């Protein structure tokens, strides 16, 4: 009997959601520092190691700031800066990309109406992508299924040059974004783009299901041709 190739995946080390530490909270101003360290060892064709056995160490660090806005009730000014430390692309960079910006945005957050932010954001497409993103090294590549990138400023889940509204109403999550790009991408193909998503949670006892839908539309710069 001919045996097909089987894969063995072994995870070791520490992997978690971001741990946060509040280092300042006074007079309506807050400052949180957070981060994550992730270590992985894998072997097999269905893992990031391919046909070999490899390890990967990565992580992230960020700061989140808020300030009460007195002129608008229940509203805060918010800002986030987050960096990727070394890499999350399953290799071991030790050069200039040791620290890459993941998020950098400022905006307003209202208790009732949600937040309006601008900068490099976690875009609306991630409402769908986050369902399996935590397993991206060991599941089919969700980034390939109808999700398009045409230049460095219009890509999968971290979006440059974006004005975005995020809101939650009675279990409904809505995100809308207008994308102008950052003007410093490798091929500057983007003229403008728009994204939207909707996510709803249903709970049946201890069981919960959360369907989501997202859409993305964009316009290329006139005269720019790419293969994406």
Predicted regions and their residues:
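Short polar catalytic/cofactor-binding loops
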Residues: 37-44
